[in-house]
């Protein structure tokens, strides 16, 4: 039986994803002592794990290097490309928010300047509202943009809101909820249908148990 390759997002989401996989009965013990390794193998199942950056999960799945990927909905939305999304994993929950300083007027007709790491998501949001805005892409700490008068407001991912508060910002609008999603390579799904659907069944059961706790 061919080993399924699962691309996991490095970082915060990795920890939650591994915990969910373990709860679903997937052995991930090889990942506990990873050092500089980026490829791991389950000792009990024909499954391998690849640790990559979030945006690269989609690339590995698209090209069939990975059969399955676990990645945040925010990354999928910003990529705005077609991905075969099969399951909401109910982990890594947060949301896109519009935030700024207390003196910001969201109802102003003046053309606003919006700073964000997610220009595609921001454009979609304001287009749906019928607003014409200027969008500035920022790769680093976007929270300081309104404070330094680079932008009128920001669009960013918010989990607890503590970082916004620490920088004197408040949330003006909650936009889109986000969580980790399981995406699948379409060719892999045809070739490994039984294996992939068995894994999905295991994950669905683990998610139900997690939500019931």
From Swiss-Prot:
Database matches in CDD domains: PBP2_HisGs
Reactions performed catalytically: 1-(5-phospho-beta-D-ribosyl)-ATP + diphosphate = 5-phospho-alpha-D-ribose 1-diphosphate + ATP
Disulfide bond positions: none
Subcellular location as annotated: Cytoplasm
Entry's Gene Ontology cellular component terms: cytoplasm
Keyword set, alphabetical order: Amino-acid biosynthesis, ATP-binding, Cytoplasm, Glycosyltransferase, Histidine biosynthesis, Nucleotide-binding, Transferase
Highest taxon, organism lineage: Bacteria
Pfam families registered for this protein in UniProt: HisG
Enzyme class (EC, first level): transferase
A biological process term (GO) from this entry: L-histidine biosynthetic process
EC number(s) given by UniProt: 2.4.2.17
Keyword Transport (UniProt): no
Metabolic or biological pathway: Amino-acid biosynthesis; L-histidine biosynthesis; L-histidine from 5-phospho-alpha-D-ribose 1-diphosphate: step 1/9
GO MF term set: ATP binding; ATP phosphoribosyltransferase activity
PROSITE patterns recorded: ATP_P_PHORIBOSYLTR (PS01316)
Main function: Catalyzes the condensation of ATP and 5-phosphoribose 1-diphosphate to form N'-(5'-phosphoribosyl)-ATP (PR-ATP). Has a crucial role in the pathway because the rate of histidine biosynthesis seems to be controlled primarily by regulation of HisG enzymatic activity.
Subunit structure: Heteromultimer composed of HisG and HisZ subunits.
Domain-level remarks: Lacks the C-terminal regulatory region which is replaced by HisZ.
Similarity comment text for this entry: Belongs to the ATP phosphoribosyltransferase family. Short subfamily.
Protein name: ATP phosphoribosyltransferase
């Amino acid at each position: 039986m061919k080993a399924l390759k699962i691309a996991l997002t490095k970082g915060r989401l990795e920890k939650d994803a591994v915990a969910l996989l373990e709860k679903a009965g997937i052995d991930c013990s090889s990942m506990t002592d990873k050092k500089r390794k980026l490829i791991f193998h389950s000792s009990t199942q024909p499954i391998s794990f690849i640790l990559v950056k979030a945006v690269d999960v989609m690339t590995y799945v698209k090209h069939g290097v990975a059969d399955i990927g676990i990645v945040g909905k925010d990354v999928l939305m910003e990529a705005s490309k077609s991905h075969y999304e099969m399951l909401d994993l109910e982990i890594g929950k947060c949301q896109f928010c519009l935030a700024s300083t207390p003196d910001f007027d969201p109802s102003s007709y003046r053309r606003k300047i919006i700073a964000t790491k997610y220009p595609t998501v921001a454009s979609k949001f304001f287009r749906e509202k019928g607003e014409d805005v200027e969008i500035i892409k920022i790769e680093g700490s976007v929270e300081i943009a309104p404070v330094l008068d680079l932008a009128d407001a920001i669009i960013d991912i918010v989990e607890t809101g503590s970082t916004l508060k620490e920088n004197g910002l408040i949330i003006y609008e909650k936009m889109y909820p986000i969580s980790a999603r399981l995406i699948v390579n379409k060719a892999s799904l045809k070739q490994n249908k039984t294996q992939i659907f068995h894994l999905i069944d295991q994950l669905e059961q683990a998610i139900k148990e997690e939500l019931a706790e």
